[in-house]
């Protein structure tokens, strides 16, 4: 396992310093690599966010194609957050509706780039869609609601293992809703359950229940 970033690891673990905006850095970091998991994201600056989210996705997939790597896990926010806000059980394959939000548009473009490379070069690629990461809860929150598209770190780690173990990705690219909360039933996990065997590792939503 090789970690790559532009910043030092918060716990002092060894990493490769790689700027995803620089193709040569990305390409040289992939020597001897069997699979790539892309968790890059930047939101706060419009110029840099385009370079990281869009150009970065291009550089990664081009480097993957150039080196012959055949497995990629790409990540990003769902493209159904605005238009489908009043629906329930929203499937991952609902038509994308990224709205006019600049960040969502950059991630929409990155997904299309990844999909195009995956199908042209026959790279088995999974796109994991979620809206926020969270540590495992340690106490009852007493909240009246929960964020319905957040995934717990533990669950994402399991989903990544399941994705790496999936030998064949239909049509070389498939997107998956991923979250840790069955309770709200807003975003469907059916596809992830069926193709990956994904289920939340614990009943995380129980931590949201109010005492009566």
Which functions belong to the PLM regions below?
Residues 59-100:
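Conserved Rossmann-fold NAD(P)-dependent oxidoreductase catalytic core, especially the SDR/UDP-sugar
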Residues 12, 18-53:
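NAD(P)H-binding glycine-rich loop region in Rossmannoid oxidoreductase-like domains
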Residues 87-125:
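Catalytic helix-loop patch of NAD(P)-dependent Rossmann-fold dehydrogenases
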Residues 173-199:
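Conserved C-terminal active-site "lid" loop/helix of NAD(P)H-dependent oxidoreductases
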Residues 130-137, 150-173, 181:
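Alpha-helical substrate-binding/gating segment
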Residues 4, 39-40, 72-78, 128-130:
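SDR active-site strand-loop-helix element
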Residues 80, 102, 120-146:
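Flexible, glycine-rich beta-alpha linker
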Residues 18-21, 48-59, 67, 105-106, ...:
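Glycine-rich NAD(P)-binding loop of the Rossmann-fold in SDR/ketoreductase-type enzymes
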């Amino acid at each position: 396992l090789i970690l790559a970033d532009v910043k030092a690891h918060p716990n002092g673990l060894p990493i490769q310093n790689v700027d995803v905006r620089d193709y040569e850095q990305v390409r040289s970091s992939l020597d001897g690599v069997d699979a790539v998991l892309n968790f890059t994201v930047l939101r706060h600056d419009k110029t840099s966010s385009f370079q990281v989210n869009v150009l970065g996705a291009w550089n990664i997939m081009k480097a993957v194609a150039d080196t012959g790597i055949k497995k990629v896990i790409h990540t990003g926010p769902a493209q159904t957050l605005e238009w489908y806000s009043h629906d329930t059980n929203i499937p991952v394959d609902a038509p994308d509706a990224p709205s006019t939000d600049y960040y969502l548009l950059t991630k929409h473009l990155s997904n299309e780039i990844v999909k195009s490379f995956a199908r042209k070069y026959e790279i088995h690629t999974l796109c994991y869609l979620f809206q926020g990461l969270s540590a495992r809860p340690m106490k009852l929150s007493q909240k009246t609601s929960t964020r319905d598209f957040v995934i717990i770190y533990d669950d994402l780690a399991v989903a990544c293992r399941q994705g790496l173990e999936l030998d064949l990705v239909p049509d070389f690219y498939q997107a998956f809703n991923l979250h840790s909360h069955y309770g709200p039933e807003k975003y469907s996990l059916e596809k992830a359950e069926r193709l990956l065997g994904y289920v939340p590792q614990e009943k995380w939503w129980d931590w949201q229940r109010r005492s009566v």
